[in-house]
């Protein structure tokens, strides 16, 4: 695999050189137009935007006219014939094709406009830098903006644009002009590719180029950032450049969800926002009950900042809108926590005992017995600190490896000897934990149930039940009891499994923090707390139980989607990052996004030293402390220390405090001081300790004095699983040709070294006669670490790819149901629902069964005669028209009742006592609608139909999501039957969706046929 990657990298670099040559040709055209634009007046420069828009409109006019003509042909009425239904389908297909042609035509004209449009943006930036004020003739947008923007003022038909404005409370004087490399980056973004630009190369300014160009179509450009601060900052910082040209700019994170102002933000030409908010707005839009409440426009073009963080690091976690289930705190966590904790402590006690024994055995020369006991400790708790330290000592790692190799022979045939004394076994590479037979027996005894882990064969019990000579009602009661018991037991087993995960795989101050009696997740990529996010599948509740904090109510997902599937819905997608090259293969295969590495504006002079490897963590940390003291005290340089967890950042800080070295700590606990800490981080002699800085958008400024001293020094305390995160840390120094340095300190006890067997380097240290405090460095170490990181990246890619296969199934279902729901918002779907139901009815069954099925759905007898049924000809067509007829009779009956209520209401209004009876009723929803739209009784009935359909879509969809999650979980067991779980999942998911959609249609129609206006109203 690594050999294949080397070939891919070779061709990628070759291709990149060709891409850069092509970009330089376009760059020359931009510079040609820049020469012309210098001669333009301010008004002439501004009028170029209107000229561009006219050209786009002229090119697409005929296509839009054709589209509008087809839209007029669509048939929207309460009753629609089957022929009209098919006609609508053909028209909609043709409209979709025209929309695609419009997009292609717009892309074609935008590509033609690109050199001149980019030149306009650069010339605008230049004029803002070189002039304190730019005076132009006022237009309509100027008048609107003058009410809320301090940087422009109106005087006698003229607008004065100042080059001074504020963002995030800071005042700035515009001083930026696009470099040539930034223009190249802008071209790549417009092409729908990823521009890899090193940290400090001005990606925020680069984005203004494709933003301006693509906003000319009027369809909206979304600029996606990884956090709220960046979304607000960038929108305020860059807005005047676009607003000067008549484009509107806004940020969704400034406003509350579902608000009028957020809707207006989406109507802007350019909309900034965080990835999560864009996704949640999409999900919320598919839960509204009126078109007036829709927030987002059609997804057109998105530019994602830190695209690798959004589409790769966060791709595995779906975003979920859920509702708390009242009173549904899972009591099993309280019931089972103490039992799992007891089991965990028993194993810890046992491992401590046999570890001491194994150490004595190995020291005395009994390597066989000592190796077996050492391997037991490794299988039972691989992160056990005394074990890690012992393995770093002479020959001990070799003893463990030899023992492991022996027991893994013949497909782990003898592994039961090792595991027989353990309660659970941890696989650190796969990050999994499983109960051993001893652990299963322990929990079963604690629960006083020898079959605790065995689920009953419910299918067999149902068969046995049918043979019993009892009434149908009794059978139904027993059946419900069996189902309830089955799910209760299944839930207890699941709870035990989640609790053991919480105790063995998740660590406080690494994976999560406990703040204000709540468990808060720490983002491993950024070191930030992820607010309002919880681990799924009961794991978060297990952690709450473990930490003895309040266990929050369980919740039911109402809507869910992954970032991957949301962003793939945009017509065009592009992104920027300083670290995309390492994930090139994934971007191509999953998103069809090419990566182009943009050259730096100035040569990089940063010194990147080889990694330094120590035997133990203690030796490593001592060396790090000494290096920090030397750099900050002797060389007076600012030092940024990058750590992988809150725990390590606090350890380094305490060690420095003991030596009276002042330091600032930036982690999930101190994130509120972030702005101050970053501002201080570039000053002479300042030491800053931070958890992973990837994706933070931090710009550590250094003075000319610090540049002379050697610039910002980066010290890494450990290599991350991903090379990208390491590169993000390194990228904090050496920006725009500034001096700087980076150095990583490692030990054989680090997770990366242990899990991937790199701690076997200890044998090399032994052969070299390594002494305490000495270290290894050089190409061998760096290459070995890079290979290990590549293995992890490949493994993570495989996991994400597999997860995407699963999510693609429900994604197709989601797209279908959301389209169906959007139609339900806009048109009357009753005829379509009747058609869907009739189409699914089996006309090949016996007449009695056929008639019973019809009655169960429509509650109407004698819909089809026996003779008509026998003929079979056009039976479904006849059925469709007959049901529609009854449906309209039903509507007219309701309508006549409402007419009676209307006249009655006039009388009620004269008498307050009688009016109170009218207002409070079972059918309060109908009355509320009626009071709003009393003059349009047909609209009341149509609204009732719409609300019924939308209610059942939402209600049944959330149940379907839950069922799909269960199916995903249980399909994994098919691997024991030598079957591919994904194939089983796809087959069953198809059946599950068909049943869901059939029931949705059936329930909607049945409800309308049976609902009544309460007689108490009359």
Curated annotation (Swiss-Prot):
Catalytic activity: ATP + H2O + cellular proteinSide 1 = ADP + phosphate + cellular proteinSide 2
Enzyme class: translocase
Keyword Lipid biosynthesis: no
Pfam families listed in its UniProt record: P-loop_SecA, SecA_DEAD, SecA_PP_bind, SecA_SW
Keyword Protein transport included in the entry's annotation: yes
Protein localization: Cell inner membrane; Cytoplasm
GO function term, MF aspect, one: ATP binding
GO biological process: intracellular protein transmembrane transport; protein import; protein targeting; protein transport by the Sec complex
Keywords assigned: ATP-binding, Cell inner membrane, Cell membrane, Cytoplasm, Membrane, Nucleotide-binding, Protein transport, Translocase, Translocation, Transport
Membrane topology: Peripheral membrane protein
E.C. numbers: 7.4.2.8
Binding site for ATP: 182, 200-204, 699
Function: Part of the Sec protein translocase complex. Interacts with the SecYEG preprotein conducting channel. Has a central role in coupling the hydrolysis of ATP to the transfer of proteins into and across the cell membrane, serving as an ATP-driven molecular motor driving the stepwise translocation of polypeptide chains across the membrane.
Family named by the database record: Belongs to the SecA family.
NCBIfam families (UniProt xref): secA
PANTHER family, per the entry: CHLOROPLAST PROTEIN-TRANSPORTING ATPASE (PTHR30612:SF0), SECA INNER MEMBRANE COMPONENT OF SEC PROTEIN SECRETION SYSTEM (PTHR30612)
Complex and partners: Monomer and homodimer. Part of the essential Sec protein translocation apparatus which comprises SecA, SecYEG and auxiliary proteins SecDF. Other proteins may also be involved.
Protein name, entry field: Protein translocase subunit SecA
Taxonomic source organism: Karelsulcia muelleri (strain GWSS)
Lineage start: Bacteria, Pseudomonadati, Bacteroidota, Flavobacteriia, Flavobacteriales
Gene symbol of the encoding locus: secA
């Amino acid at each position: 695999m690594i050999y294949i990657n080397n070939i891919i990298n070779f061709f990628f670099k070759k291709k990149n050189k060709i891409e850069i040559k092509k970009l330089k040709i376009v760059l020359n055209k931009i510079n040609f137009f820049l020469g012309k634009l210098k001669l333009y007046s301010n008004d002439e420069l501004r009028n170029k935007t209107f000229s561009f828009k006219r050209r786009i409109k002229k090119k697409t006019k005929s296509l839009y006219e054709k589209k509008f003509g087809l839209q007029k042909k669509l048939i929207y009425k309460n009753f629609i014939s089957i022929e009209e239904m098919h006609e609508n389908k053909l028209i909609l297909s043709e409209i979709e094709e025209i929309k695609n042609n419009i997009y292609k035509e717009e892309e074609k004209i935008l590509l033609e406009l690109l050199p001149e449009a980019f030149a306009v943006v650069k010339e605008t930036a230049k004029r803002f830098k070189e002039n304190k004020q730019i005076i132009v003739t006022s237009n309509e947008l100027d008048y609107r903006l003058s009410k809320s923007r301090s940087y422009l003022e109106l005087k006698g038909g003229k607008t004065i644009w100042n080059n001074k404005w504020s963002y995030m409370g800071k005042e700035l004087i515009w001083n930026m002009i696009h470099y040539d490399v930034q223009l190249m980056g802008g071209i790549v973004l417009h092409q729908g590719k990823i521009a890899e630009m090193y940290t400090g190369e001005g990606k925020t300014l680069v984005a203004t180029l494709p933003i301006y160009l693509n906003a000319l179509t009027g369809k909206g450009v979304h600029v996606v950032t990884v956090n709220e601060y960046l979304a607000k900052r960038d929108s305020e910082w860059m807005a005047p450049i676009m607003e000067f040209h008549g484009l509107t700019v806004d940020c969704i994170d400034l406003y509350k969800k579902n608000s009028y102002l957020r809707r207006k933000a989406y109507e802007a030409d350019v909309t900034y926002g965080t990835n999560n908010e864009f996704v949640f707005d999409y999900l919320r839009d598919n839960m509204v009950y009126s078109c007036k409440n829709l927030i987002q426009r059609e997804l057109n073009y998105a530019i994602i900042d830190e695209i690798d963080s959004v589409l790769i690091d966060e791709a595995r976690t779906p975003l979920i809108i859920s509702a708390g289930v009242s009173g549904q705190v899972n009591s099993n966590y309280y019931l089972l926590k103490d039992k799992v904790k007891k089991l965990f402590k028993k194993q810890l006690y046992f491992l401590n005992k046999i570890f001491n024994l194994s150490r004595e055995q190995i020291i005395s020369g009994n390597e066989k017995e000592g190796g077996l006991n050492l391997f037991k400790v490794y299988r039972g708790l691989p992160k056990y600190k005394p074990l890690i330290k012992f393995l770093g000592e002479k020959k001990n790692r070799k003893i463990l490896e030899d023992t492991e190799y022996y027991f893994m022979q013949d497909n782990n045939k003898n592994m039961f000897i090792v595991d027989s004394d353990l309660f659970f076994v941890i696989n650190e590479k796969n990050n999994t934990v499983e109960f051993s037979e001893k652990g299963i027996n322990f929990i079963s005894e604690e629960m006083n149930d020898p079959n605790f882990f065995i689920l009953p064969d419910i299918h067999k019990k149902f068969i046995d039940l049918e043979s019993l000579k009892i009434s149908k009602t009794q059978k139904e009661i027993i059946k419900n009891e069996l189902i309830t018991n089955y799910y209760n037991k299944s839930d207890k087993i699941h709870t035990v499994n989640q609790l053991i995960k919480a105790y063995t795989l998740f660590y406080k101050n690494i994976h999560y923090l406990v703040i204000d009696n709540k468990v808060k997740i720490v983002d491993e990529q950024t070191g930030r707390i992820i607010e309002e996010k919880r681990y799924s599948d009961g794991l978060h509740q297990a952690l709450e139980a473990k930490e003895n904090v309040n266990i929050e109510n369980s919740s039911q997902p109402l809507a869910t989607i992954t970032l991957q599937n949301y962003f793939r819905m945009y017509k065009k997608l592009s992104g920027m990052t300083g670290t995309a090259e390492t994930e090139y293969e994934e971007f191509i295969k999953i998103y069809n996004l090419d990566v182009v590495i943009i050259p730096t504006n100035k040569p990089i002079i940063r010194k990147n030293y080889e990694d330094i490897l120590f035997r133990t963590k203690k030796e490593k940390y001592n060396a790090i402390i000494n290096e920090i003291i030397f750099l900050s005290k002797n060389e007076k340089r600012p030092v940024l220390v990058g750590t992988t967890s809150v725990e390590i950042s606090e350890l380094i800080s305490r060690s420095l405090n003991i030596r009276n070295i002042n330091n600032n700590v930036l982690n999930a606990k101190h994130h509120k001081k972030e702005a101050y800490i970053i501002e201080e981080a570039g000053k002479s002699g300042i030491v800053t300790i931070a958890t992973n800085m990837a994706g933070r958008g931090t710009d550590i400024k250094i003075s000319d004095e610090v540049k002379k001293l050697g610039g910002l020094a980066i010290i890494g305390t450990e290599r991350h699983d991903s090379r990208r995160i390491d590169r993000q840390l390194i990228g904090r120094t050496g920006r725009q040709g500034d001096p700087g340095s980076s150095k990583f300190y490692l030990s054989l006890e680090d997770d990366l070294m242990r899990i991937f067997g790199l701690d076997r380097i200890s044998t090399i240290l032994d052969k070299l006669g390594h002494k305490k405090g000495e270290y290894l460095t050089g190409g061998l170490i760096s290459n070995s670490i890079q290979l290990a990181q590549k293995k992890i990246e490949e493994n993570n890619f495989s996991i994400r790819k597999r997860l995407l296969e699963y999510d693609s199934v429900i994604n197709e279902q989601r797209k279908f149901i959301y389209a169906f729901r959007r139609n339900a918002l806009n048109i009357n779907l009753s005829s379509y629902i009747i058609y869907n139901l009739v189409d699914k009815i089996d006309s090949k069954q016996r007449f009695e069964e056929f008639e019973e099925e019809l009655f169960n759905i429509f509650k109407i007898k004698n819909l089809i005669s026996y003779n008509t049924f026998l003929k079979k000809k056009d039976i479904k067509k006849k059925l469709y028209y007959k049901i529609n007829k009854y449906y309209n009779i039903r509507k007219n009956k309701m309508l006549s009742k409402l007419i009676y209520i209307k006249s009655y209401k006039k009388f009620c209004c004269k008498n307050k006592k009688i009016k109170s009876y009218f207002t409070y009723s079972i059918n309060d929803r109908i009355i509320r609608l009626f009071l709003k739209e009393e003059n349009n009784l047909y609209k009341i009935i149509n609204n009732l139909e719409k609300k019924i359909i939308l209610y059942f879509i939402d209600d049944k969809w959330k149940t379907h999501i839950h069922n799909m999650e269960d199916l995903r979980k249980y399909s994994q067991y098919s691997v024991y039957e030598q079957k591919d779980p994904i194939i089983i999942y796809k087959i069953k998911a198809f059946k599950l969706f068909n049943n869901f959609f059939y029931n949705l249609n059936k329930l909607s129609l049945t409800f309308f046929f049976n609902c009544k206006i309460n007689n108490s109203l009359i």
